[in-house]
Design a protein with these regions (language model features):
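Glycine-rich, charge-decorated loop segments at or immediately adjacent to ligand/cofactor-binding or catalytic sites
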Residues: 246, 251-266
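Ser/Thr/Gly/Pro-rich low-complexity, disordered linker/stalk segments of secreted
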Residues: 1-32
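Conserved post-beta-strand hinge residue in the HATPase_c
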Residues: 98, 250, 296
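Extracytoplasmic/secreted cell-surface and envelope-processing proteins
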Residues: 103, 212-215, 253-257, 280-283
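Glycine-rich, phosphate-binding/catalytic loops in enzymes
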Residues: 108-114, 221, 260-265, 288-290
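Active-site neighborhood of phospho(di)ester-bond hydrolases with catalytic His/Asp-centered motifs
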Residues: 204-206, 245-249, 272-273
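Active-site core segment of subtilase-fold serine proteases
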Residues: 33, 39-173, 181, 186-223, ...
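Extracellular S/T/G-rich loop segment that most often corresponds to the catalytic His/Ser-adjacent loop
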Residues: 261-322
Length: 322
């Protein structure tokens, strides 16, 4: 190791070692995350996975792939927004999910201060401590199973023109993560949906109740839940109101109906259903009169008849299965 000149000619330790990296994930997790040193690396270049991202621009085929359900033009038409200068710059999105890989090189340039870790230390037998498991500002995945939030964040705001991966729909938007699903009791649900409503513009919630074909109500009860959303809608963004986006539900195969799934039918909720690359309802996507909009997604059938969505995953990886 090259000696460090301390500037002290009178002696002292001139072989000082750098401080060890700070562990920000919980020691009980299988995935280990350390606080990055310095600023994110500035990369440039075309995004190599972008040609696979049919949801951004659907040409009716993907090189090297054969699909029977793909139709040119069935996409978000997002390039029109980009060409108008609308790329997410100045917009802050809170990804409320199972975790966020804040070190992923395709996400890190867009991560800003304000994330929150809801994970609690387990005491065994379904008992949990009040102590946060890990660092309070680092809602990083605990295992490979906690990759969903990272993939959702990538769809929203993976960085563009950085020479790696693909690109997000709003590639210059700012991201924060709330790993609500790590410990999603009623208090934390209300806290996550009201956290930083003066700074967050959008709360993305790609989660919901069990797909069991039953009527579901919020764990906190309708009054507390609706009051929380009403506060964000009326007082968030300095009175302009925040946007609450919820998944319309993936339980169509189980007979679920989106209107019966708690949050998705609350006043002010933007409920989103899924379409495949041919522009038709994905077979798992729930129907409902509450649905606000449908957007491109995977089809999730075997064998694959339509392409899935390519997006970041944990530990610098990418996936089309999440």
């Amino acid at each position: 190791m090259k000696p460090v000149n301390s500037g002290n000619n009178g002696g002292g330790n001139q072989n000082a070692r750098p401080a060890p990296p700070e562990l920000v994930s919980w020691s009980g997790c299988s995935l280990k995350y350390y606080r990055p040193q310095g600023q994110p690396e500035i990369r440039t270049g075309a995004d190599p996975l972008k040609p696979q991202q049919w949801h951004l621009k659907n040409l009716g085929s993907i090189e090297g792939k054969r699909y029977t359900r793909i139709k040119a033009g069935e996409d978000l038409n997002v390039e029109a927004a980009w060409n108008s200068g609308l790329n997410g710059d100045g917009i802050r999105v809170a990804v409320v999910d199972d975790g966020l890989d804040m070190t992923h090189p395709d996400l890190r340039p867009n991560i800003v201060d304000g994330s929150h870790n809801y994970r609690r230390q387990s005491l065994g037998e379904n008992r949990y401590s009040n102590r946060i498991a890990g660092h309070k500002d680092w809602p990083v995945p605990c295992s490979e199973d906690d990759s969903h939030g990272t993939s959702v964040a990538g769809i929203i705001a993976a960085r563009d023109y950085n020479g790696i991966g693909g690109t997000g729909i709003a590639p210059r938007a700012s991201l924060v993560g709330y790993n609500l699903l790590a410990f999603g009791d009623e208090r934390n649900i209300l806290d996550a949906l009201s956290r930083d409503i003066d700074r967050n513009h959008i709360f993305n919630n790609s989660w919901g109740p069990e797909d069991d074909g039953q009527l579901n109500k919020p764990a906190s009860g309708w009054t507390a839940f609706n009051d929380t959303l009403a506060k964000g809608l009326s007082k968030g963004r300095n009175g302009l109101g925040v946007l609450y986006v919820f998944s319309g539900g993936n339980g169509a195969w189980e007979g679920d109906y989106s209107s019966a799934d708690s949050a998705t039918s609350s006043r002010g909720a933007i409920s989103v259903c899924a379409t495949d690359a041919a522009g038709e309802r994905a077979p798992y996507s729930e129907r409902g009169s509450n649905l606000t909009v449908c957007a491109p997604s995977g089809r999730s059938t075997t064998p694959a008849s339509a392409p899935e969505i390519t997006t970041p995953s944990v530990k610098d990886k990418y996936t089309d299965d999440f």
